[in-house]
Amino acid sequence: MQTNELLSKIEENIAKVMIGKREVTRLMLASLAAGGHVLLEDVPGTGKTVLAKSLAKSMGCGFERVQFTPDLLPSDVTGLSFFNQAKGAFTFKEGPVFTNILLADEINRATPRTQSSLLECMAEGQVTVDGETRVLEPPFFVIATQNPVETIGCFPLPEAQLDRFLMKINMGGMSADEERELIDRFIHAEPLSQLGEVCTAEDIRQLQKACREVFMHDDLRNYIVSLVQATRKNRLSAGAGWQGVSPRGTLAFLRAAQGYALVEGRDYIVPEDIKTVAVPVLCHRLIGELEEAQKESLVNGLLNSVELPTEDWKKR
C-alpha cells in the first residue's frame, strides 16, 4: 500500500468517529510516521481518549491502555519478575508496554516515579527490569493524554519526559455545527465500537521506513537550525531559567516535518510542513516561566522573523 493511500485511509477511518479534528488527526499521523510519540492535552471530555482509541482500532496492531493514577507503580507499566514456584525460577511477567500502541491515559495523574518508567521505552524502544533488557516490537507508539496542570490531582510531567514526546497537541473546542453533528452521529449509535482495521503493523513499519527517505532541501535544513538556534537566544526576554530547544528537539523537528510531508502526499519537505509542526514540536521543549500562549506566540514570531529563501524544494 502506498504511503499516501495508507495515511488517507487511516485519516478517513478516524473521521467516522472524530468530528472537526482533522488537523489534530493529521499531526498525530505525522508523529506516527516519524516514529515519535504524542501527548494530547486539554480539559476532560474533549475527545483525547476517543481519538487515541480510534487510531488504535484503525491499525491491526497490539493495543494496551493504562489508566494512570497516583497509586500506579512502575512495575504496573513495565512488568516485573516473580518467583515461579512450579518452575523453581524467576519468571518475567510483561507489562502493558509490550504492545504496539500504548495509551497512557491521564499520564499526569501518576507520580513522577511512575511517569519516568516510560522514559527508556519511549527513547530506546526497550525495557530494562532487574538488569535484563527486553526489546519492544516495532512499531511502538505512545499516545499519552493529560489534563492541564491546573486541574486538581495532577503532577506536571518532568522536562526529560516531555522531551520524549515528538509533539504535544491541544485538542481544541468544537463549533456549534460540529457539536450538532456530534449529537446526530452518536444519538442512536456508538461509531467507535463499529470502527474496523484499515492497515497492519507491517504497513506502519514500511510507513516509518519511507518517512526517513523524505527529502529536505539544504536551505530548509538551515531554516530549521536557525529557528532552533533562535529559541536559545531569547533568555533575556523570556525570563529566568529559560532553556531553548535541545539538539534532540532539532531532530524531532526534522522528523515531524518529514512525517507531515508524507501526510500531505509528498516525498519532499516544503516550508509549510515546518511551519505547521513548529508549535506542536517546539513549545513543550521551551523551559522557562512563560505561559503556554506566550510560548506559542514566541514560536510564531520566530517563524515570521527568520528569513526563508524561495527555492524549488523538490530539487535534490
Task: Give the label of every model feature segment.
Residues 26-30, 83-103:
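Conserved alpha-helical scaffold flanking the Walker A/P-loop in AAA+ ATPase domains
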Residues 84-89, 110, 114, 122-201, ...:
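Canonical AAA+ ATPase core
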Residues 233-316:
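C-terminal engagement/docking regions of AAA+ P-loop ATPases
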Residues 43, 77, 145:
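P-loop (Walker A) phosphate-binding loop of NTP-binding proteins
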Residues 32-69:
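Walker A/P-loop
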Residues 42, 105-106, 117:
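Walker B catalytic acidic pair
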Residues 58-86:
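AAA+/P-loop NTPase substrate/partner-engagement loops
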Residues 2-43:
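Pre-Walker A (pre-P-loop) alpha-helix and adjacent loop at the N terminus of AAA/AAA+ ATPase modules
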